[in-house]
């Protein structure tokens, strides 16, 4: 019989302090990625994405090995894992809160709910609105990204994950990613690791209500788990409703002492109002309101931006996922085979300038991972390899947005994509203190688009800019063919070094290449719309002006060379721990998705040369038996390099400094209190010309939890304690106006409470 346990952020050599508000807050802020990375495919644990995940003993590694810290220390790059026990206890759990303790991962909330926050790591995918590329997002080691690399971030639900793996930069190459940003892997719980049942009810301000739960069972040779999460909210702003339903199940089987298998399935349904941006002055006066579009008087235009009240932008999306993972261990050889299929529906009602985009299609994924570990005492496999192939197709239809209703079709496309990624790498020990890790990755991608619209013209509509509720005569423009066939190939070599002068400290350095092809969203964009007219109609009052409704830029793949170095360690007593990484990237052909002063799409372009410099710093400390804290600091200086138009300006949308800190007090055995702050102390550029900026802000939250019994606890929190008015994010444009609607207000002060019961 194999014993199974939850992979926990504890080890015999690194004590942890049980903190109920933040969960188990390890003295090392980032508990070994390895605890999940290299153990996750063990039959008793969930599905890590990393190869070699079962190279360690299949008995209880987390309890018997005592070297979990060493697993993390061996990695020559930025990586972390956040267990569900480490999430802040919250009535409104979001990705930004779940990952608040991880430096280098910048999450900017858009509308406060389960919608489309901007997630960027090291600036990859930074300038998409919304961000839909730049990071490989995985569920149990299989991508929720579509075959072209795009993803819907709202499907990522931290409440449905037992842990989240974070691989920053090239450390994600072993997973099949070659992008600059890296990868996030949401790992499901299993019946072996989490037997019994759990139920969490929560609610609070802005109509927030939710219920989540799971039930798991584990026997000697098999296990199973079912989970669900339902949430909804009215939202902070006037037009701000959102809801999400997620369900999932997995079944594991110990076929033999050498073979384990797991089958899993999940479904997510997401819907949210797009409350849209506000001009800064309007946001400061009343952040709850939504915008009614530009003011036009005597031929002049003030406050350019979308008319949210009339157009009622919204997104409704669903995704079904089914997959399997099979692991075979033959002495020092480990083989891992994964197969997956996703079917995605996405109905995105943009403002009139882009119309309604409906996309529906499926994607198949196949992954083969191999690890060779002849030395059982080694932490990492001597050799590891991954091959991943994703292929998919989708139908895409474009319709006019007529005051929030679906109008005539003006575009129809059949989209196909395929991506092959291959990775191979060594971890070569040079004595007891030094490891050299050379690796090579290759990626080949195909993007095909067949324009099947079939009509000679594309319809257009418009409204009177001076009275935007009054429709103008309909029009039509010639239907230019938008078909294309593009292919991209690139190599991504890397070389990493680690040096361990003591058992508690590690220094590392690495140089790597990254390669990121454009997605269909980059290659096919609606253009020539305005806040009062549809694509192809740049002048609302002139329906006869011939202008293309789509742009299909011939884009190059984005590539970069990155050097990074870091130092992580802890004091001998374990009261202080740190993890710091600095990196510099020379980026070529950075993919930028541009918008004009009204927020209308201009399509994607390649920047010539850009530079990304950053520092990722995490620290954790235990001051007394009852007081502890942690800090996650991210510095980002992303700039154009000798650009003929933008010079050496900062890339819009990237906060230069982001500090997230938390303090925890264990007031008694059953009662804990905590406080946290999210502080952006510097202005953030809204446009690439650096003429408009979002102001600095600080948001303070308070939390508390009380354990009524061993199985029941209650919790409460106050978010944005001082009711600050601030922009949690912005639109990103190339050239802004001072009065432009570009600012997305963060939630005001809110109160949440909940009850958690285990059975």
Question: Where are the language model's segments positioned?
Answer:
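Solvent-exposed loop segments that connect transmembrane elements
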Residues: 275-308, 397-410, 447-485, 521-553, ...
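Transmembrane beta-barrel wall of Gram-negative outer-membrane proteins
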Residues: 196, 203-232, 237-285, 312-334, ...
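Gram-negative outer-membrane beta-barrel transporters
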Residues: 370-371, 432, 436, 444, ...
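Membrane-embedded beta-barrel scaffold of Gram-negative outer-membrane proteins
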Residues: 221-222, 336-340, 346-347, 500, ...
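C-terminal beta-signal and adjacent terminal beta-strands/loops
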Residues: 4, 515, 679-686, 705-759
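Short acidic/polar hinge/loop motifs at secondary-structure boundaries
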Residues: 126, 135, 142-169
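Extracytoplasmic beta-strand/coil segments of soluble accessory domains associated
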Residues: 96-142
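N-terminal periplasmic "start-of-domain" segments of outer-membrane beta-barrel proteins
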Residues: 57-90, 116-120, 135
